[in-house]
Regions:
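Nucleotide-activated sugar donor-binding and catalytic core shared by glycosyltransferases
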Residues: 1-304
Length: 304
């Protein structure tokens, strides 16, 4: 099977497509051509309306990509009706032109015939029966969905460490994490290792597959579902939001269904004193396998 993969250089997008192709390769012999998207969207639209097709050496069976920058280049590259164009995530333009769109369920109130939905985001399934005594703390940062409160998050981290004092705690930050928070984490002697994206970067994937416990801030949606797709227990920190939207509703769904455990702030009975409590996940849900559902749907629809 010949695959043409359009890439927009965004790690989160490319990891989702890579997970699909890795899973598809378990049952199909794949020949993958990668194409980087470089033109601005307006130029791609201009070329699309002029029906100017890019050069290609062979006709692919599937054209696939994720992210708005890949939408028009993928459609322009299709020259044969036998080629199927798949958008991973809801495209910015021309939804009806795609043979298949695989997108988060929260993006659609009504699902068209050419759309297949999944929960959250797509991630590689990683099953490890030999988990290590490691706890991960994965911190996002300033965002438009949740209030990033340094003090409240630090108090939750201290609470978690006090519950599991024998765990080796490793903290990962992100480019969005405030400097003040980073400085506070560096001073916490209960943390075994602080992996700062700016100074001593290490791949999170190396730890995600072997950590017994994983605590993630709810603004890091892709990371939540990467964690849920790996062995070990996933928990969400408590972050307040002022306005409900599809992301906050998704996080509420994850918590209400107990896909992940979560921290919660409550008042003591008949008191003005607030406490933090830990709610456990329902382990009967098992490891998330959304990528396998997506690949099954691709094979079902486009089986030769």
């Amino acid at each position: 099977m010949k695959i043409c993969w359009f890439k927009d250089s965004k790690i989160g997008h490319e990891k989702q497509v890579q997970a699909i192709l890795d899973n598809l390769a378990l049952t199909q012999d794949l020949v993958i051509e990668e194409r980087d998207v470089s033109n601005p969207v307006w130029l791609e639209l201009f070329l699309y309306f002029l029906r100017i097709k890019p050069k290609q050496d062979s006709i692919p069976d599937i054209i696939i990509g994720a992210g708005s920058a890949t939408t028009i280049p993928m459609l322009r590259y299709k020259t044969d009706n036998k080629t199927k164009v798949i958008s991973v995530m809801k495209p910015q333009f021309f939804e009806s032109k795609f043979d298949l769109i695989v997108a988060p369920r929260h993006d659609y109130k009504e699902v068209p015939d050419n759309v297949f939905t999944y929960v959250g985001s797509i991630a590689r399934v990683n099953i490890n029966p030999d988990l290590e005594n490691i706890g991960l703390i994965v911190v996002g940062g300033v965002n438009k969905h949740f209030d990033f409160n340094d003090g409240y998050l630090i108090s939750q981290i201290d609470f978690v460490i006090s519950l599991f004092p024998d765990i080796n705690w490793i903290v990962f930050n992100s480019r969005r994490t405030p400097k003040g928070f980073n400085e506070k984490i560096k001073r916490n002697t209960s943390i075994r290792k602080f992996i700062d994206v700016h100074k001593n970067f290490e791949p999170l994937d190396d730890y995600l597959s072997k950590a017994k416990l994983k605590f993630v801030t709810p603004d890091s949606v892709n990371m939540i579902f990467e964690s849920l797709s790996s062995s070990g227990e996933t928990y969400l920190f408590d972050m307040h939001y002022s306005k409900e939207n599809k992301i906050t509703r998704l996080i509420d769904e994850v918590k209400s269904n107990k896909y992940a455990g979560f921290l919660e702030e409550k008042y003591l009975e008949t008191s003005e004193i607030k406490t933090i409590s830990l709610n456990k996940p329902n382990l009967l849900h098992g490891t998330f396998r959304e990528v396998e559902k997506v690949v099954y749907e691709i094979e079902r629809r486009f089986r030769k």
